[in-house]
Amino acid sequence: MSSRGEVKLERTHRFLWSKKKWTGIPIMSANMDTVGTPAMHKVLTKYKLITCPARHFLKKGIDKFNKGESNICWFGGIEDIAKLSKTTTGFIGLDVANGYTIRFVDAVKKLRDKCPEATIAAGNVVTADMTQELILAGADIVKVGIGPGSVCTTSCLLYTSPSPRDSDQS
């Protein structure tokens, strides 16, 4: 490769559980009020990026986004499984601050049971072990999210995980 202009970010993915195929740039917007908006979705879709609408749109405002759109991922909490199972977009997901609980793994299983054809994203986790656990529970995509706060337990796990380099030196 002689120039960074030759880099191709677009990829085609076939998902483990849903068996669906998706082509685009595998980057999801944050589901924050200022980012997950209908206006932002119009722009991100032009570049084949995935929009995660802000959570308040799941409660009231799903109709503001294109129905059946393949570049939308509706994230909700464990209490939103019934609502998520009724959406017709490309991706649905469970988004919690700390994905390291049995309750969360069980919620992913429940969502998979309710929506066997859906491409499901789940997170937030940061370790390989929990990523594997969520995939085995039915997640097609595992979300790694590290919060900005000092009490973010995901960042605590990241900072305390031994790096491969450290274990090689022992």
Predicted regions and their residues:
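Glycine-rich beta-to-alpha transition loops that act as phosphate-gripper elements at the mouths
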Residues: 31-36, 74-79, 121-130
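Conserved small/polar residues in nucleotide/adenosyl-binding loops
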Residues: 159-164
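Surface-exposed amphipathic alpha-helices with a cationic face
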Residues: 45, 63-66, 85, 105-115, ...
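N-terminal capping/small domains of soluble enzymes
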Residues: 1-71
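Active-site beta->alpha loop and helix N-cap motifs at the rims of alpha/beta catalytic domains
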Residues: 68-83, 89-93, 98
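Catalytic cores of alpha/beta
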Residues: 83-84, 127-138
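Glycine-rich phosphate-binding active-site loops on the catalytic face of alpha/beta enzymes
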Residues: 55-58, 96, 144-155
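Short beta-strand/loop segments at the ligand-binding rim of alpha/beta enzyme cores
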Residues: 27, 67-74, 114-123
